[in-house]
Regions:
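N-terminal cap/lid segment of alpha/beta-hydrolase-fold proteins
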Residues: 1-52, 141
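Short beta-strand element of the alpha/beta-hydrolase
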Residues: 54-63, 176
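Glycine-rich His-Gly loop
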Residues: 60-64, 163, 180-181
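Serine-hydrolase catalytic-loop signature spanning alpha/beta hydrolases and amidase-signature enzymes
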Residues: 64-67, 88, 108
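Primarily recognizes the serine-hydrolase "nucleophile elbow" in alpha/beta-hydrolase
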Residues: 100, 104-172
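Short beta-strand/loop motif that positions the catalytic acidic residue
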Residues: 171, 176-179, 183
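Short alpha-helix in the alpha/beta-hydrolase fold that links the catalytic acid
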Residues: 173, 187-194
Length: 194
């Protein structure tokens, strides 16, 4: 985990500019839900706007389910994808309930697609480390249905980086996975099995 100063400044400047034009952070829980469970307070989606009605991506950052490394692990990817015309969201999740929060984020975007001007039927789930596990897990159709029901389509793709998640199922979305041969977090041999 490494913060690139110039990239971080570029991201903050972009969010500042966008924040003057449109909403850049969407809480995914209602005020009533937050009153009942204050841990939901800062949970939500940063929005990097792409083209109107283009597909969207949700980025789930790593942090070993100990912290949320959005600035260095998700924001750079979201910025790049939005500059290519795709709508990109970065999920700020609770480390105690990451899968619940990702499912809620998917539902939130699906339910608010008209307001957000995104194509609700075409999306991808991205993640690094712990976030990759989240993306792969909710990219599985059976798991997705168990969280959100049958109304929301499965993601078109899952993009996973540096995680040892090696479960495979016929219900998984098409998946791209990458790790480095010198990665100290995960053994590359684990991913070859996937």
């Amino acid at each position: 985990s490494c913060i690139q100063v110039s990239q971080t400044i570029k991201i903050i400047q972009k969010l500042n500019e966008d924040g003057q034009k449109h909403t850049i952070f969407y809480p995914i829980y209602s005020k009533t839900e937050i009153m009942k469970d204050p841990s939901k307070k800062d949970t939500g989606l940063f929005f990097f706007k792409g083209n109107d009605n283009a597909p969207f991506a949700i980025f789930n950052e790593g942090g070993g389910f100990m912290y949320v490394g959005a600035m260095h692990d998700s924001f750079p990817h979201a910025l790049e994808l939005s500059q290519r015309g795709y709508n990109a969201f970065v999920l700020i999740y609770r480390v105690s309930h990451p899968y619940v929060d990702l499912a809620r984020a998917i539902s939130f975007i699906y339910d608010h697609a008209s307001l957000l001007k995104v194509d609700k039927n075409h999306y991808s789930l991205w993640g690094g480390s712990a976030g990759a596990r989240m993306a792969a897990t909710l990219g599985n159709k059976k798991v997705l249905v168990s969280y959100v029901g049958n109304d929301i389509p499965q993601s078109d793709a899952v993009i996973m980086q540096y995680t040892g998640y090696n479960h495979i199922s016929l219900y998984d979305a098409p998946t791209y996975a990458c790790v480095g041969s010198d990665d100290y977090i995960v053994d590359a041999a684990d991913m070859k099995k996937r």
